[in-house]
């Protein structure tokens, strides 16, 4: 399927600010205001691809009992919550608070050791008991006298990236207890507030920089007979309709919490999302001749920027050394191109490819399929370029040098193998990146070259028939004079009419 994932992850609270907030909360704890506060922040990000496909990929990584995919008019909710807030079956209420986290090991033996470590850890058990007691008291407001019991205390559940400590609390209620009474007594879940609940919520309102929204609320199902089941929407993505999303994460702060450890725990909890392999590699292709690699630092700068955006590890010094070795000595006089492939885990490969004869003098073909200007992948050089490869092959078969694309608004974007410049009314123009295209290295050089005095401007397909010239640019071939093929020119004229 088509790639789907996230990029451009941004913390709503910087690490330094988070450490300050932990200190403030611990001052409240020392003063006796509370004994536990759940401190949270958000990861904001861009997403690409189909939300349902993203849900399926993440569900493979986060096998949970209380997940949900909800399509809304203005976005989607992708919940991968492992935590039960409250469930009703007849006259029985069940809550299953989750508090206590440990990372997974690399081997079964390491997993066993870490699982046991979490189960016996005094700090995690103390935090957990605080919330179990809080939930027992909340359920006690609804249950019959003596009707609350803890069935399973300090259970450890296994997930793909971590272990979690849970307990199961059961309360027997009268048949007359209604949903609104349950919500009034239990909401919000104590595991995401702290204890005592009301004072913890006041401190949260003072310290957290923005409302939590759905995160830490409740979502679930209602049955006609009055039964229901609600999760706590932790590990839950909220996606809008414009390619942006957020994920709330947090941890419990107590008097002996170490702020750096709590911040690391938050990052561990979000790793099911941030560690998702995007299903593609980053690419850089550059020309090499007797002098060396052309515009090497510009290529490595673009690779570094894309790696940062998509969360790839990238060691440019190692890649630079590898390129020097690939080039060898002496360099030789026949130009060739080097191709760099970088995967998310930082692994990279280099390939030396001979330059073909090219297709100078052949015209451009208008690609029949449009691109989406909002597709963030178009702004980065990746292996997720099936549409471009298909249209390039179609163009070559039909006797053209390349395929020229337009977006959903009828704006010219780029060719499958380079950027395009169009001369209109005596001035060279190239489409802005916002139209949905790669900011090519050669494109940036031409924009800075006084010989062209080129500018960025939206170019519509119907502008092409009156073009006084066209250039195709890429860092391997340089700047090529091209023209629109007769059939494609006729199509552009038809658009104009």
Predicted regions located by residue number:
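Helix-start/capping segments and mature chain N-termini
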Residues: 128, 165, 232, 249, ...
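Extended alpha-helical targeting/anchoring segments
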Residues: 1-282, 407
């Amino acid at each position: 399927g088509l790639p789907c994932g996230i990029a451009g992850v941004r913390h709503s609270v910087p690490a330094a600010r988070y450490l300050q907030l932990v200190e403030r909360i611990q001052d409240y704890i020392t003063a006796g205001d509370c004994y536990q506060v759940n401190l949270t922040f958000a990861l904001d990000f861009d997403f690409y691809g189909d939300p349902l496909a993203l849900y399926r990929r993440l569900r493979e990584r986060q096998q949970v009992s209380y997940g949900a995919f909800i399509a809304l008019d203005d976005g989607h909710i992708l919940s991968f919550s492992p935590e039960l807030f409250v469930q009703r079956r007849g006259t029985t209420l069940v809550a299953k608070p989750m508090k206590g986290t440990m990372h997974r090991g690399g081997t079964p033996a390491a997993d066993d050791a870490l699982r046991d470590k979490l189960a016996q850890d005094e700090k995690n058990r103390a935090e957990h008991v605080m919330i179990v007691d809080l939930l027992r008291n909340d359920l006690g407001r609804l249950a019959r006298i003596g009707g609350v019991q803890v069935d399973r205390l300090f259970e450890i559940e296994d997930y793909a990236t971590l272990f979690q400590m849970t307990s199961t609390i059961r309360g027997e209620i009268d048949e007359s207890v209604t949903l609104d009474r349950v919500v009034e007594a239990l909401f919000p879940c104590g595991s995401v507030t702290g204890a005592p609940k009301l004072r913890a919520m006041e401190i949260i309102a003072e310290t957290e920089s923005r409302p939590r929204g759905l995160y830490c609320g409740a979502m679930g199902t209602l049955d006609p007979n009055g039964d229901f089941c609600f999760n706590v929407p932790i590990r839950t993505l909220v996606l809008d309709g414009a390619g942006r999303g957020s994920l709330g994460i947090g941890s419990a702060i107590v008097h002996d919490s170490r702020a750096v450890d709590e911040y690391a725990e938050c990052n561990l909890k979000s790793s099911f999302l941030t560690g998702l392999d995007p299903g593609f590699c980053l690419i850089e292709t550059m020309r090499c001749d007797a002098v060396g690699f052309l515009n090497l630092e510009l290529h490595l700068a673009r690779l570094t920027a894309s790696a940062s955006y998509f969360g790839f590890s990238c060691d440019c010094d190692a890649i630079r050394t590898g390129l020097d070795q690939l080039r060898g000595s002496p360099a030789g006089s026949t130009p060739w191109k080097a191709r760099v492939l970088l995967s998310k885990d930082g692994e990279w490969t280099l390939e030396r490819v001979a330059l073909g004869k090219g297709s100078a003098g052949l015209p451009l073909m208008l690609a029949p399929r449009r691109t989406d200007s909002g597709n963030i992948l178009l702004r980065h050089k990746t292996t997720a370029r099936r549409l471009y490869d298909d249209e390039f092959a179609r163009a070559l078969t039909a006797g053209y040098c390349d395929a020229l694309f337009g977006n959903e608004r009828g704006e010219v974007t780029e060719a499958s193998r380079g950027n395009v410049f169009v001369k209109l009314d005596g001035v060279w123009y190239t489409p802005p990146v916002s139209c949905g295209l790669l900011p090519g290295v050669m494109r940036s050089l031409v924009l800075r070259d006084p010989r062209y005095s080129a500018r960025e401007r939206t170019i519509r397909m119907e502008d092409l028939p009156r073009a006084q010239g066209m250039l195709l640019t890429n860092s391997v071939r340089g700047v090529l004079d091209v023209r629109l093929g007769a059939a494609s020119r006729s199509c552009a004229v038809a658009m104009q009419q």
